[in-house]
Every structure is written in C-alpha cells, then in structure tokens.
Amino acid sequence: MSRGLELLIAQTILQGFDAQYGRFLEVTSGAQQRFEHADWHAVQQAMKQRIHLYDHHVGLVVEQLRCITEGKSTDVDFLLRVKEHYTHLLPDYPRFEIAESFFNSVYCRLFDHRSLSPERLFIFSSQPARRFRAIPRPLAKDFFPEKGWEKALNNVLSDLPLRLPWQNKTRDVGYISAHLVETLGEETLRHSHLQVANELFFRNKAAWLVGKLITPDATLPFLLPIHRSDDGELFVDTCLTTSAEASIVFGFARSYFMVYAPFPAALVEWLREILPVKTTAELYMAIGCQKHAKTESYREYLYYITSTDEQFIEAPGIRGMVMLVFTLPGFDRVFKVIKDQFAPQKEMTAAHVRACYQLVKEHDRVGRMADTQEFENFVLDKRQIDPTLMALLLQEAPDKITDLGDKIAISHLYIERRMVPLNIWLEQVEGAQLRDAIEEYGNAIRQLAAANIFPGDMLFKNFGVTRHGRVVFYDYDEICYMTEVNFRTIPAARYPEDELASEPWYSVSPGDVFPEEFRHWLCADPRIGPLFEEMHDDLFRADYWRSLQTRIKEGHVEDVYAYRKRQRFCLRG
C-alpha cells in the first residue's frame, strides 16, 4: 500500500473523532433547554443518545477505512506507521487524550480486539506530561464577598445563564449564607471567596452549580443543586460543602453529567481539587466521557498490577450462579466473567445477561447501580492468578479462556467498583450502623423502582456498601423494567393444608412477583426483621408496587437527590 495511505487513514480517524465529539457537545448543549422546559423524558433520551454516539461514529470510521483500504490486509509495519502519523496530529489538538481512546476503539473494532499492544495502541498516553493545552477562556469565575456574602451569593445566582424566574432568590441566598456561617464560621468566611464553573452540570431534574469555596486553610467543594418548580420557577435545594458530599454527587453509581466541556482535560483537572479521592477515570466518567474513562481505568489497573506481587483471588461473598467474580486484595475493583453454564434455576442466556448490563449503562442509575466497563480479550499473567481461582476459571468459564503460554486471555469481562457485600456488612455491624444499612437498602429499592427498575433478585448478597455507607445494587442478571412485572397478592388459602403443601395452591405465570414473599428472606434474621418491618413494610405489599407502576405509566419522573432529604432547605427547621 502507498505510504500516503497511512496519513489519510490517520486523518480519517481524527476527523471521525471530531464528528463524534461535535455531536457529543451538540447533545450536551441541549441540556439547559430540556431543564427549562421540564422535558424529563427528553433528558432520559438524550442520555441514551449521547452514550450511543461513540460506538456509532466508531462504526462509521471503520466502514470508511474498509473502503479506503479496499479490504486489503494490513501488515504490522503499516499499522505502526498509521499510529505514528496519528501521534503527529495530536500535539496541538485540544482533546488529544480522548482522540487517543477513539483511535484505540477504531483499531479494536477493525481487528476484533486482537493483537492489542502498546506499539499498536495508545495503551499509554503519547503526551503524559501534558494534561491539557492552554484554553481560550477561563473555566470558572471568581466571586469575592467585598460587600458581604449575601451580595456575593446574589451575584452568583444572578450570573447563571438560566432563563427562568426565581421562586425566591432572597430566601435561597439566606439559606446558603446561613449554611456557610454554620459550617465555617463568620471569621473564616471573611477571608474566603468563591470560584464557580462557567458551565452548569445537568443531571436528572437538576442543574448543578459547581464551584470551589476557597478559604485560608483549604479549598472546599461548593455545590448547589438548582431545581425547577412545577410553576417553572427556580430554587436552590441545598448547599454541599464537604468532600464526602461532593464525592457522592460525582459517584460511580450515578448517571453522567451533561456539562458542556470542549476541553474535557482542563475541566477534569479543575474538578480534581474538590474531588481529591476520585481517580482520573472517575472524573472523565462523571462528565460523560465514558470511553476515555475506560482507557484511564485500564491504565490505573496496569499501574497497580505492575507494582504489586498480589495474586488475583475469588472475590469475597457468596458465589454467584451466573457470574464468576475475582479481584486483587488491594485493588478497589472487581472483575466479573459470565459463566459458560448457569445454575438450573437461572433460565437465561449469556446474551440476556449482557443486555441487562447494557440496560444499566444506558438507564438512569439514580445513585443505586454501579457503572461497569466492558473488556474483550483481557490478558492476565498466570503467575498472578491464585491456583484456586485458575481452577475455578477453567471449570466455570473454559470457553472464555485462551491459553497464551505464560498468560491467559479472557474473551469477555466487566470491571466494576468493589464494595463490601451487604450480607457481609450486615453480619459485621450493630446498632446505628445496622439501622442505617437497612434504611439505605430500602431506600435503594424504592429509588430503583421509582426509576422503572425492578432488581429481580433482592437478596442482600446482590447489593454492596460503598465507602460512604451507601447501598448500591450490582447483580444485574434478573433486572427488568418495573412495567414488565405483574405484582400480585398471594390468594387466601382454600384449606389449612394448602399452606403446608410443597407446591403453591395458586397459579404462577412468568413475570408474576409476590411481594409478600420478600419477607421470608429479608426478615429471617431477628436483628433485621423488626427494623425492616418498621421502615419498609410497604415493600411487602403488592399495592405499593402497583401504585409505582401507575405513576411510571402516567409519565411521572421522580426527583433524585444525591444527598439525604433532611439536607434539603425546604425540610430544615
């Protein structure tokens, strides 16, 4: 092939990425209008559309390249020259880091995720020292309380691009000011100021103002969720100023923000100061660059695996009937492989399981479902696999394992944040911690249901506890939409003997769910049963679930709060 062809291919890939990110920004830029018009269903559709854009544009580029090369095979030297030309296009490119990930995706689509090596792919960044280039305008604006904090806060709210009237701006400014005084004290505030991002962060039914509260001693988060009333008026729902609160808002179990970010690396770097525990991958994920977040996540994994002598082991917890889960003892993620054969009671296919995971990726996760990254032909060094785990992999998923000599390749797996399984957590805690966990579990079920998600298998083992004590669902093989379920009350027994029979005295059809049965496995522990009955007894009634279904079918979209309801200004004393 002509040497000029390599440059043409490199340019075609970069132009394809330009087109993809342009559409990404176009969809994102509509977030403000969707919020102002309260078009919540359009919010959900835009979220799915934006996720699909990436793979769609990768596919378009792949088809272009097949036409350009006329289907001829390409040798290794040719591919290396394509990457070299592509690398030379990036030094002055404003989104070079995501462009590298796009190149990787095109390569993997062309070559079916095979022959993946640092020479052919951007497994490591071509410009590791350059996080981002100079940008044409600042990301944020400073506000100083020269005439008092209430005046400064009024200026912050007045400066927003939102075109709706305020319900009561003076009231909200008073709430925020009082919260800052209560949290930091007047003396500290006298020597502090705000730096507020120019772009709002939209998600669900809220527009988030994201800023930094810069004090003499520290830089703190300054987050204001702005909501729209049914009358079309704006109000601030709360003010969050701790790193823990900010971490939850930007958490891995939440949908991606819609924030206009033509220079994503610069925004990630700006956010890092108020989200110090978040990795680079998590920050890119939060702003919707999920494919590049996958690249960064893999780099974080490579950094860890090359600096430890730990071995992969089976993950703690009850072994699943569908997934084989393993981890590294000191790593904060788990690796999930779909088994070749499922337990008899799991009447489903691997394709169904993958569809469930994709549903979660595209759906509003409401802070209650863990995000995942999907990998193909994932290579592990045999020396770093515990023999017991190796035997288990070969027993449960032999069709997915390829022996490469001193390594193995797993044809398909998911990587997910590691949490403490809820069943283990409940065994270890007492008192207030136990009560909080049961309250959190019930809240998770309610919020998932309100978002039109029924977990299917509600056993404690299918949920995890995060470092912030939040309960998150992570076992998706039986997940379905609430509207697909037939919630029924168990009919009264005809005779006393019916209740002692091994088979039910009533008919059961596919899709039937009897909430009364939840009590048998959720309340069996005498420490847990009374707490569950006190806080969540309505979960055992079919009419509760049917009422949620009615609201969903009527088009109602529930509010989702990334903080405790007691923190809302409208509920404070």
Swiss-Prot record:
Q: Where in the cell is it found?
A: Cytoplasm
Which residues take part in binding ATP?
315-321, 336
- Superkingdom as given in the UniProt entry: Bacteria
Give the reaction(s) catalysed.
L-seryl-[isocitrate dehydrogenase] + ATP = O-phospho-L-seryl-[isocitrate dehydrogenase] + ADP + H(+)
Q: Has keyword Nucleotide-binding?
A: yes
Tell me where it mainly resides: cytoplasm
Q: Which GO terms describe its cellular component?
A: cytoplasm
Active site per database record: 371
Write down the EC number. Answer: 2.7.11.5, 3.1.3.-
Q: Which GO terms describe its molecular function?
A: [isocitrate dehydrogenase (NADP+)] kinase activity; AMP binding; ATP binding; phosphoprotein phosphatase activity; protein serine/threonine kinase activity
Q: Which GO terms describe its biological process?
A: glucose metabolic process; glyoxylate cycle; tricarboxylic acid cycle
InterPro entries registered for this protein in UniProt:
AceK_kinase, AceK_regulatory, Isocitrate_DH_AceK
Which of UniProt's keywords are assigned here? ATP-binding, Cytoplasm, Glyoxylate bypass, Hydrolase, Kinase, Nucleotide-binding, Protein phosphatase, Serine/threonine-protein kinase, Transferase, Tricarboxylic acid cycle
| Record-stated family | Belongs to the AceK family.
**Which function does this protein serve?**
Bifunctional enzyme which can phosphorylate or dephosphorylate isocitrate dehydrogenase (IDH) on a specific serine residue. This is a regulatory mechanism which enables bacteria to bypass the Krebs cycle via the glyoxylate shunt in response to the source of carbon. When bacteria are grown on glucose, IDH is fully active and unphosphorylated, but when grown on acetate or ethanol, the activity of IDH declines drastically concomitant with its phosphorylation.
Q: What is the official name of this protein in its record?
A: Isocitrate dehydrogenase kinase/phosphatase
> In which organism is this protein found?
Enterobacter sp. (strain 638)
Q: Which gene carries the instructions for this protein?
A: aceK
